[in-house]
Amino acid sequence: MYDTIVIGAGQAGISIGYYLKQSDQKFIILDKSHEVGESWKDRYDSLVLFTSRMYSSLPGMHLEGEKHGFPSKNEIVAYLKKYVKKFEIPIQLRTEVISVLKIKNYFLIKTNREEYQTKNLVIATGPFHTPNIPSISKDLSDNINQLHSSQYKNSKQLAYGNVLVVGGGNSGAQIAVELSKERVTYLACSNKLVYFPLMIGKRSIFWWFDKLGVLHASHTSIVGKFIQKKGDPVFGHELKHAIKQKEIILKKRVIAAKQNEIIFKDSSTLEVNNIIWATGFRNPLCWINIKGVLDQEGRIIHHRGVSPVEGLYFIGLPWQHKRGSALLQGVGNDAEYIVKQMNGE
């Protein structure tokens, strides 16, 4: 019987592990990956974080390098591995959770390896779990090369011809800019694009967000509600420049598909050769067989990561408490709070 089991060894789960190591708890982190940092390693080759190194560290250990510079995905992978080794955080890899049950005052976790029992359970699988691909993708011809942004590594995966990137978030923006240098590239967005600079006066924009209190705005505050309503901006002006130079052709929201053709909200159409769905992720928790975890719309019920189900906690959710909860730097604050709640502090 463990005191605590954490499911997920990404930055959120590792942050929980950091604070659990400072307590007397017997705990372990389970993850289906083959190595620490695998979810970062599997992202596209050119991925660079839009948060500076100063805001890309977990508690207790800074990310090395120029603090206002922007780390690559490989830096983050190496950092996470070094972090786990330094703090001797117990992780069992290649362990996929099949189901979770609540039996009286403990949780029963069934995996592909064995069963585990624990008094406390922390779900740290995060929001980037299962690719969210629109159902209209099934209406396209098999001749169309389709990838989700989580599957995209580089342009070598694409077939000859044009590419449509669907989704105007930061991943979609970076991928579209990269591909526009070698082929005809379209970008379909549901909303008007808003751009923020990466740097202001030789400092990362997140330094300014920090000083202005934006990173510390709770999800229930006036500032927090405003930011959530507006959504995240595109950081950097590379996309804006590429659109202005007509290197990327901006399209309206995708509403339908038929064989080789995509139909947009303004009724225009486009014959495509490749599509990259930069349409985000969903986090299905069908393996948690416990009443009271989700509301009627399938959303996680929690207050700052604490579930109404006794002993159950969540970490790594967008806006779990503050704007900064989604950042490497911010997840540590949520982890510290959860472990304190767990210990009755």
Swiss-Prot record:
Keyword field: Cadmium, Cell membrane, Cobalt, Cobalt transport, Ion transport, Membrane, Oxidoreductase, Potassium, Potassium transport, Transport, Zinc, Zinc transport
Membrane-protein topology: Peripheral membrane protein
Subcellular location: Cell membrane
Main localization (coarse): membrane
Xref: InterPro entries: Auxin_biosynth/cation_transpt (IPR050982), FAD/NAD-bd_sf (IPR036188), Flavin_mOase (IPR000960)
Pfam family, one: Pyr_redox_3
Positions of disulphide bridges: none
EC number of the protein: 1.-.-.-
GO cellular component, one term: plasma membrane
Zinc among keywords: yes
Gene Ontology molecular function, alphabetical: flavin adenine dinucleotide binding; monooxygenase activity; NADP binding
Role: Involved in potassium and divalent cation transport. Enhances the transport activity of the cation/potassium transporter CzcD.
Protein's UniProt name: Uncharacterized oxidoreductase CzcO
Organism expressing this protein natively: Bacillus subtilis (strain 168)
